[in-house]
Amino acid sequence: MSKSSTTTKNIATPNRVTVHPGEMLNEEFLKPLGMSVNALAMALRVPATRIGAIVKGERAVTADTALRLARFYGTSPEFWMNLQAMHDLTKARMESGEAIARDVRPRAA
């Protein structure tokens, strides 16, 4: 069974930050294949520090990295970019959502 906490339910839950794409990369792709960060970095032709920082949740998945991951794993770049966008949005909602709702008024029709 997957250890990843990414589910449709989690994405829809406004009080919870969705999983960072690095956790998904580690739990659903690297570990099952027994692949190291260094091996993936070599295969993608990127610095190991980039992949390591993504796996640790310290760096976002960029469009360039999404293209490389998609090519290597047979996924789509949108898969990786959507994971990043959902993570960023839920994190921003948790950190700033109330202040934004309080400070920004909807445009009058």
Model feature map: region roles:
Residues 1-12, 95-109:
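Polybasic, lysine-enriched low-complexity intrinsically disordered terminal tails
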Residues 10-35, 82:
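A short, Lys/Arg-rich alpha-helix, primarily the initiator
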Residues 36-42, 69:
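Short alpha-helical "recognition helix" segments of helix-turn-helix
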Residues 38, 49, 78:
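Key DNA-contact positions within bacterial/archaeal DNA-binding proteins
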Residues 45-61, 68-70:
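Recognition helix of helix-turn-helix/homeodomain-like DNA-binding domains
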Residues 64-82:
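DNA major-groove recognition helix of helix-turn-helix/homeodomain DNA-binding modules
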Residues 79-97:
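Short amphipathic recognition helices of helix-turn-helix/homeodomain-type DNA-binding modules
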